[in-house]
Every structure is written in C-alpha cells, then in structure tokens.
C-alpha cells in the first residue's frame, strides 16, 4: 500500500507567470511526488501549491520549492493583500494515507533545518511541530509581516527554530510544520467597502471570540472592486464549510450586503464537500461511506 502525505506550500508571488512556472517546475523535477494543483491570486500576490506523494521524496520536493522561491522572489519589492513574511511563506505537511502525524513532524524539522543550512533563510516551526504553545498559530508568527520581522526576531519569544536572529535580506523567514488538512475558503461580498469585510472577519474568527478553528481577514480585490472575507479553516470536521458560509451570510445582512460568490483555494478533502452537500440538500438517512461512489474506489 502506498504511503502518502500532502504538502501545501505558499509563495509570495501571484502575478509573474514565469516565476510561478519556475517554482512549479522545481516541484515537478522530483520523482515520487505529484503537483496536483496550483493557483495564484493577483490581489493577494500569492500562489498556493498542492503536492502529494511519498514521504521520503516530499522533503526533497519541499526543499526545491523553497530554493526556487528564494532564487526568484524579492520580498523588499513585494506588495499584496495577503499577510506574508517570506518568499516561501509557509510549508505545511499533512498525513493522508498510512502516515502518522509524528512522521510529518519529523519531515518538517528535516526540511526546516535544510532550508536554513543551505539557503540561509531562518525557519520557525508551527502547528504540530511547534516548540512552544505560543508558536503554534501561524497568524501569531506572521504578525507584523516581512517589514517588522527584523525587529521581531530580536525578541527571545520569536527566535527562529533554525537560523540566527536576522531575516534573509530578500527572502525573509518561513514557517514550516505539520498540521491537519486546512480548507482555504474566500467569500466575496456585494460591496467595495473593505471595512465591512474586516468587521465580518473579526466576528467569525476564533481569535476575536468567533468560531473555533477559523482564521479570517478582510481584503480588497482591487481589480473587481469587491471586498472579500478570506478564511482559513483549520479543522473542517469541527467547524464545517456550510456553518462558516451561513454565518458570513447572516453577518453580511447586518450591513445591507450579500454574498456574490465564493472560492476554494487548492485541493479540499472530499468529506468537507460531502458534508456541505448533505446540509444544503437536506439529505435524510445519508451514509457518506456507502453512498458516495469515490469511497468505494479509493
């Protein structure tokens, strides 16, 4: 039986197609892994890649991804709506099939150490790989973004796990870790007022007293003149997609706006979508393990 893990690295480039393809080709050069998907957002100026494959080869694929980002992306010239602190901003590893979380943690440490030793980019371990409770949350690590990192890394609480207390001059710093599958979900509103998106994001995110397992910010999509609630769901089994969507819809109505569209970034676990379909279709006596064709084929 094949053993499979997933890696979903994010890079701080969403506009230059040549650079994005250069990074994609770096992943494709590694045998034993598959680049399943990659998507870019010009407003966020960010790309998300989904790689799956053999655990032994995934460490090499993640490193080559990071190396390509360091070679091609200059954070001193980067501007975008999405928070970021590095050229390769985050590298998460997720167990998929017959791989324990502990193995993903070890892979994350191996990759983090190599990024520092060979690329000179400091690394902070996060989520399940974190070395202290306050370092689990990516948003806390990234707070202040690239511009504030030189000062932040002088604080002993935020010393990198690999590297010294200085950021890479053009590549910044990267978070590497192991985690549960994440659902990246964006909801677009019928308004150009980004403050409304900010208020809704604050209401729904866990850090402000909202829903557990939800991280959210408001962003402005300049090209579409549309405000967006950008959401990361860190445990879709505890806080499902439909609940987040309905809460945003309810909160938007307070401001006289409605949802005009939504998008999923990257690959999403099948169960997350099946659960959403079950809710909206009001299915009775539905058995997802026996009534979903793909469950019998996988």
Which role does the model predict for each range below?
Residues 1-298:
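Long, contiguous binding/interaction regions
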